[in-house]
Amino acid sequence: MKRTSWLWLVPTLALVSGCNTALDRARSTASVTVEPQAKSDLWGAVATAEDRDRINRLGLAWQEALTVAKPKHAKEINSEGLLLKPRSGLSRPEPTPGSYNCRMISVGKTEPKAPVFEKFKPFFCYVLTDDAGVLTIVKQTGSRRPAGRLWEDDDPNRLIFLGSLALGDEKEPLAYGEDPARDTAGIFERIAPFKWRLVIPWPRSGAKLELFELTPVADQPEG
C-alpha cells in the first residue's frame, strides 16, 4: 500500500515540472514592447497652450480669412495659386539649408481697422541646420524678424514652426517662450518643387493668417 500510494504522485510531479518549464521558456522569450513617442508630443511639450490652440484652429483660420478677403480680392488670391490654398502640403516638407527669397501676405483680420488682404515687400530669409539635423528659419531683414525651429509632426506632410520675433535693431531674437508676446507658431509645408510656405494662424498682427513664401536663392553663398 505504501509503495502504491507514491505512484499517483509521479504523473502529478511530471505535470508540474512541465508547467514550470513552459513558464520559464515563456519568460525567457517574452519581450517588452515600447510604443514610439508621438512626434506631436515633442513639440507639444514645448509649445504654449495658446500656440497649440492656434495650430489646432488652423482650418478655421483659413476658412475665415478667405471668406472675408475673397469678395474684394478674389483675383489677387487666385493669382497666388497654391500659396493661398489650404491643404496643399506635399510630402518631404523639409527645406534645404541655405538662403531664400521670401515674401509675406496677410489675409483676414481680427481688428476692425486691419486690412483684409495685404502684400509686403520681398526680403531674404535663411534656413540653417546643426549637427543634429535640427532646422531653423531666420528672417534676415525688416523691422519684425521671426526666427525659430522646425519640428517634425505626426502629419508627414508638414513641420511645426515655433519661434519668436526680433524687433528693430536687435541682433538676436528671443528664445521661444521667453516673451509670450513675441512667441510665434505655425505650419511649414512644401507646396511645389523648390517652393515652401510658412503659415502663421491667428498672428498678433491683427490678421487671421500670415503666409511666408520661400523659394531658394539662385546663387547660394559658398561655405
How does the language model describe each region?
Residues M1-W8:
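Bacterial N-terminal signal peptides that target proteins for export
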Residues R92-L159:
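Mid-length scaffold segments of soluble, non-membrane domains
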Residues N20-P95:
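Amphipathic/hydrophobic helical signal segments and adjacent flexible N-terminal regions
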Residues L15-G18:
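C-terminal motif of bacterial Sec signal peptides marking the signal peptidase cleavage site
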Residues L135-T141, F161-S164, L198-P203:
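Short beta-strand segments that buttress and anchor functional surface loops
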Residues N78-L82, A175-G223:
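Edge beta-strand at a domain terminus
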Residues R145-E152, E170-A175, A207-E213:
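A short, polar/proline- and glycine-enriched secondary-structure boundary/capping micro-motif
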Residues T110-F123, L162-G186:
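An anionic, turn-rich surface loop/hairpin at beta-sheet edges
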